[in-house]
Amino acid sequence: SKTKNPHDYSRTPGGSSSGSAAVVASHMAPLSVGSQTGGSVIRPASYCGVVGYKPSYGLISRNGVLKVSDKLDTMGVFGKSVKDVALLAKSLIRKDLHDPSTIYFAADNMIQECEKGPVFDPKFIFYKTKNWKNINKKSQQAFEFLIKNFKKNIEVFDTPSYFDDIPKYHQIIHEVDMANNFQVYYKKDKTKLSKEMREAISRGLKYSAKEYGDASDFMKQSYES
C-alpha cells in the first residue's frame, strides 16, 4: 500500500479506504469518508486507531462514487470520536433519488443519543469462526480476557454452519460485479490496474450466471436470517 500507517510505517494501514483512516489518525483532517465492499472501513479504522462507522446498507448515498459492487458497496465515515462520526453521518444519511439503494432513516437525534451514553448494558455476541486458529496467540488471549472479565455482557455462540460459506459467496459477488463495472478499463489498458485487481477481474469474468445467482440468493437469505 502507498498509504502508510501513521503509528508505524512498517505496518499496513488496513485496506482500500486506508487513506481516509490515515488522514484522521495523522491529524491531517478531523473527518473523512470511505467506502466498504469487504471490510474497507472498519478494518482501516481499527488498524489506524480511529473511529470508523459503516452504517447499514442504503443509509448513505453512493452517488458519485466509483462503483465496485452495487450489492455490497456501502459508504462509511471516520473520525476521532463517536460524536464526531455521528455529526458527519447525520449530515450524510438521507434518501437520494440518484441512488435507488438508499432508504429513509430519521438520523436527527444521532448526536443527542451519543451524548446520553448507553441506556442499558450493552450485549455482545462472540463467534469463534474456523479462522480462530489462524489468529496469533496474543490476540486470542486478549479476546479470551474480555470474554472472561465481561461475561455478563458477552454471549459465546457456536458459529452457524452457513458462516463458512460467506467468504466464498462474497468473493463471487465482489469479483463478478467488479469485472462488470471495471471491464471498460480492463479492456482499454489492463496494465494501469493493479495486479490484484486484474486477477480479481479475470476470475470474475469466468463465473457462470448460476454461480452468481446462487451467491445472490445466499446473500439475501443471510440478510433475512
Where are the model-predicted features located?
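Short connector loops at secondary-structure junctions
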Residues: 153-170, 201-202
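Acyltransferase
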Residues: 137-160, 182-188, 212, 216-225
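Short glycine/serine-rich loop segments
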Residues: 1-92
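Conserved active-site and cofactor/substrate-binding residues in soluble primary-metabolism enzymes
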Residues: 18, 35, 45-48, 80-87, ...
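Short, flexible loop segments at the rims of nucleotide/cofactor-binding pockets, characterized by
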Residues: 8-12, 102-103, 212-219
